């Protein structure tokens, strides 16, 4: 494959964390051969016995995991997903229709690194996690920034800015229209009726009306309703 190139293997200057020999590389289901996997702080690299291989930049890696599912692949391996289409040569130029269909599909490539020593998978995964953490996604950092409208204090002091408007409850009422005030009064009336009904329903005290809590003390708040269960025993 044309994307395989010759380059010197990563070393200590690249922050090499792990070197795993005798590791098969598989790209999108096609075997690339057996070589050495290099997990360095700067990049992830693989080289075969002839010195040909490839390197992956961590910002392009969207997922890595240890796969032990035989239905996905017959051997346990380190799975790596890359946000790019690698290793495929197009024999025919794509048509305009194909380009439109592919616009909404993000290109990905799937790598599987299969070491002969399966006990090394945990160390490979740990090294990948540590190196990936050194290359945070810039988009994640941008999402933490406040993107709301900023109040320019300096511009306000120069008379060029608008002061954000805040109202107290009383001040807010004065800014209501006649329709708004009528709506507010109607809602307040409905609320007061709702509060009253929860204490007395059909002339019978509800469980919630028996006691109210003031300063952490249980107190009786509603007097006994006349004509209702006068012969009942009440504990005081």
UniProtKB/Swiss-Prot annotation:
Residues 95-107 have a biased composition (Acidic residues). The modification Phosphothreonine is found at residue 222. Involved in both the assembly of spliceosomal snRNPs and the methylation of Sm proteins. Chaperone that regulates the assembly of spliceosomal U1, U2, U4 and U5 small nuclear ribonucleoproteins (snRNPs), the building blocks of the spliceosome, and thereby plays an important role in the splicing of cellular pre-mRNAs. Most spliceosomal snRNPs contain a common set of Sm proteins SNRPB, SNRPD1, SNRPD2, SNRPD3, SNRPE, SNRPF and SNRPG that assemble in a heptameric protein ring on the Sm site of the small nuclear RNA to form the core snRNP (Sm core). The keyword NAD does not apply. One of its GO terms (biological process) is spliceosomal snRNP assembly. Keywords: Acetylation, Cytoplasm, Cytoskeleton, mRNA processing, mRNA splicing, Nucleus, Phosphoprotein. Its main location: cytoplasm. The modification N-acetylserine is found at residue 2. InterPro entries: ICln, ICln/Lot5/Saf5, PH-like_dom_sf. This is Methylosome subunit pICln. It comes from Mus musculus. GO terms for cellular component: cytoskeleton; cytosol; methylosome; nucleus; pICln-Sm protein complex; plasma membrane. Component of the methylosome, a 20S complex containing at least PRMT5/SKB1, WDR77/MEP50 and CLNS1A/pICln. May mediate SNRPD1 and SNRPD3 methylation. Forms a 6S pICln-Sm complex composed of CLNS1A/pICln, SNRPD1, SNRPD2, SNRPE, SNRPF and SNRPG; ring-like structure where CLNS1A/pICln mimics additional Sm proteins and which is unable to assemble into the core snRNP. Interacts with LSM10 and LSM11. The modification Phosphoserine is found at residues 95, 143, 192, 194, 197, 209. It is found in: Cytoplasm, Cytosol; Nucleus; Cytoplasm, Cytoskeleton. Belongs to the pICln (TC 1.A.47) family. Residues 88-109 are annotated as: Disordered.
